[in-house]
Amino acid sequence: LYTDSTHLKANANKRHYEQVEVEQTPAAYLAELDAAVDAERAAAGQRPLRRAQAAPAGPSDAGPTPEPGAHGAPAAPSEPTSEAAAADTRQIKRSTVDPEAGFMVRDQKPVGFFYLDHRTVDGVHALIVDTHVTPGNVNDATPYLERLDRARTRFDLKVGAVGLDAGYFTPWVCKGIVERGLYGVMGYRRPSHREGYFHKREYAYDPQTDSYRCPAGQIIVYRGTNRMGYREYASDPAQCRQCPQRARCTQSQNHQKRITRHLWQHFKEQIDAHRLTDLGKRLYAPRKETVERSFADAKELHGHRYARFRGLAKVQAQCLLSAACQNMKKIALLLARRAAALFSPKFWLCGALAGSLRSLYPLLTPRSPAGPSRYPAFPIV
């Protein structure tokens, strides 16, 4: 299955909006992340974190992002929330024309009020198996696992692999794919890097000692796990102060290098390793011919660039209707090709050749002296 999202311009002027305070709903995965953080800190002999109490978890408006710290804050196991993501509120732009549209701000994308159509297609015929609409300010990775499970159960699909772009490369999504026994292949996004400094990949991680080794050879040891789900590693300031490579490593006033590593980083590394294999390259290549082509046909032939209605439910109906039309056209074309193959000259030529071989088979079969052939003769067609 291949999944991606595209934006539909909402029927709302981007200049007609109001600034409102909305409560940040914690993401659904925070309860599981909190349990992992508590277990990690307990194993290291650290005290448990104090967390605020708030409403039950639900899909986050912003969703997780691939960069560290974008998951929001962890929550308590009983109430999946946290101090950083629970009781806090954030200010957003809400359209006065279509309040359910989301104000989208993305790199190399138009700015304004949009809806997002999250679409999943199969890798054989590019038939649409799921389409889901969210406001434009929702991250692509937020509804992915829920929609993947729905598509698999709704049509009883025997899915073996999934292909996604780099926007879905988050620890939570990678963990969900691995735990579902799927072979995930995701695109690559070059990480941000400050000119003149070492890349993070130059710091080698040793899983045996749970530590990093810097390019100068110093060991960066584990210091603790924060409430965001990141393990923190810190160097020895006494050694870094005299290091000749310190200018390329850190500019902190206490001469200490800090590195963070997510608790579920090994899931990301496992998924990222698939991208470099021959199987991963073959699986990822049809993505542009399936889900990307599906969006292209929808925009060119079905008016999928603009939301024709206002409100999330009506835009969802528009996307479902567009997906149904595309599926009916594709199924009709596939059935027509199959019917044409039955009446093609190649089909009848192969049939005539098979009939001739069946006719010649008794003549070429050796007969025993006793009389009839030892092999049954095929009827002449």
Give the ranges of each region predicted by the language model.
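Anion-binding and metal-coordination hotspots
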Residues: 1-381
